[in-house]
Amino acid sequence: MAFPQQRLRRTRRTAGLRGLVRETRLSPEDFVYPIFVVAGEDVRNPVASMPGIFQLSINHAVAEALRAQDLGIQAVLLFGIPDQKDEAATGAYDPEGIVQLATRAIKEAAPELLVVTDVCLCEYMSHGHCGVIEKETGEVLNDVSLELLARTAASQAEAGTNIVAPSDMMDGRVAAIRSELDNEGFENTLIMAYAAKYASAFYGPFRDAAESAPQFGDRRSYQMDPANAREALVETGLDIEEGADIVMVKPALPYLDVLRRVRETTDLPVAAYNVSGEYAMVKAAAQNGWLDERRAVIEALTGIKRAGADIIITYHAPDVARWMSG
């Protein structure tokens, strides 16, 4: 059947018709809301490159988590900013570390809210890299770093996290973490693996927020080359074999093709991270009056879900949830 019998504009004529045939629908339950937790008391430091985002002390992080829950958001993702760093990342696996303390406080205030915790060493390392450094060469040592990552995940699980999210991109980290969790009695703690994490320019504002920029070099020796798509399927497959419960593509918008290919190769839940640079671009354009923030954000997140994401990690989560409820 063709025109004039078939007129596709018929189903676009009214808001009700458009809603009736809509193929992709966003919900607050799709979102994970990142929160940056900093040491100290009553701290609320704005992140200049991410309007509306703050470094929060634990009391404010709890309040922000409760606000998200009230908006229908079911999960928060915690990133820790310790008051001290060293070359062994001791703050990452300290039972009294910033993420561990924040996890306990949030779970006490909101037992049903899901807490996801970032498993990486960069925020805790004095040099800012995601693993242990060989001092003479500056190389990030893969296998030595696995032990610290596994200890970090187990420490977070002991604090009550529901999901650990290794973002370091060391080979074999999912298997090491799964083994450590199971050995320590945390077999029900999920692993959301940053399976396809690219060495992206879009992380810049995050590194301001998390104070995690490397002090020398870059992360291209362990994060993925932005030019590669097939490699993402290899990475994802390995993480699944090693025991990942959820696999992630990061960033989201520049890698929708990768997200679609990952979605087509696994029946596991797939997450996508709408990263800080994507957030900052929309915020900057909206503040200058160059686009409609609400429409742009919803369009971007709908595109991420349409490409195959079951879970969207986004700094826009509270705004979108509020728009939906209004």
Regions found by a protein language model. Give the residues of each.
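N-terminal amphipathic/basic leader segments beginning at the initiator methionine
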Residues: 1-22
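Alpha/beta enzyme core
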Residues: 2-6, 27-32, 38-326
